[in-house]
Design a protein with these regions (language model features):
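Short, solvent-exposed polar/charged micro-motifs at secondary-structure junctions
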Residues: 1, 93, 139-143
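Substrate-binding/catalytic subdomain of NAD(P)-dependent oxidoreductase enzymes
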Residues: 1-18, 24-27
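Short, solvent-exposed loop/turn segments at the edges of secondary structure
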Residues: 23-25, 32, 164-166
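Aromatic-enriched alpha-helical interface/lid elements that frame and gate functional surfaces
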Residues: 26-27, 33-125, 129
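Flexible, small-/acidic-enriched active-site or ligand-binding loops
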Residues: 155-198
Length: 198
């Protein structure tokens, strides 16, 4: 965002918060029982905060978010709303407190689920939550397995076949292929030095 041009403020890096100095409910990392997910609820691409609240109510984990003032706040919580959040100085503190409470209730809700459960249930509801994947998660990811994304590559010096990340896309006319393993430390040093010297 052009913070200087628009509001004459220098933007400093503060993770995923942007110019809002509090965690935005539904946006950012959330801990599950067995790992983490990253949410982006309220963006134009997915379902709304009202949909997330309906899910929480359905599972009897919405606590007081179905009551006012939280319900109305949740129903309107989207990126457009966030752009107007700081326009009324008289209500900023209360809005930030409300957001902090909503986010704490959401954290408790997400913490009751495993990361795959949260991801799969979110997908069915069009809510944007993705798994923060460990290397093991990537190796076991059903979509990546189906696409045969991890590519076996021979490593003769190790006497092993290792799996490398594969093609980022598949094109029919220009197929992707891995030609060889990554070089070992210093393997091409002589070639590189000779080429640089010429």
């Amino acid at each position: 965002m052009q913070t200087w041009d628009m509001i004459e403020a220098l933007r400093t890096r503060n993770a995923h918060k942007g110019v809002i100095p509090v965690d935005v409910p539904g946006i950012g990392p959330y801990e599950c029982t067995d790992g983490w997910v990253f949410g982006y609820v309220g963006s134009p691409a997915g379902a709304t905060w009202a949909d997330l609240l309906a899910w929480m109510i359905e599972e009897d984990k919405a606590e007081d978010l179905a009551d006012e003032p939280y319900k109305t706040f949740c129903d309107g919580l989207n990126l457009r709303f966030l752009s107007t959040l700081t326009q009324d100085p008289a209500t900023i503190a209360q809005k930030f407190q409300t957001m902090a409470h909503i986010n704490e209730v959401l954290r408790r809700f997400v913490k009751t689920k495993g990361k795959w459960e949260m991801y799969e249930q979110s997908q069915r509801r069009r809510l944007l939550f993705g798994i923060v994947s460990t290397p093991e998660d990537i190796a076991k990811n059903p979509q990546l397995q189906h696409r045969q994304w991890l590519t076996p590559v021979e490593h003769p010096e190790r006497g092993a076949t290792l799996r490398y990340p594969g093609a980022p896309y598949r094109l029919s006319e220009t197929p992707w292929a891995i030609r060889r393993r990554a070089p070992t430390v210093g393997e091409h040093q002589e070639e590189a030095l000779e080429e640089a010297a010429s």
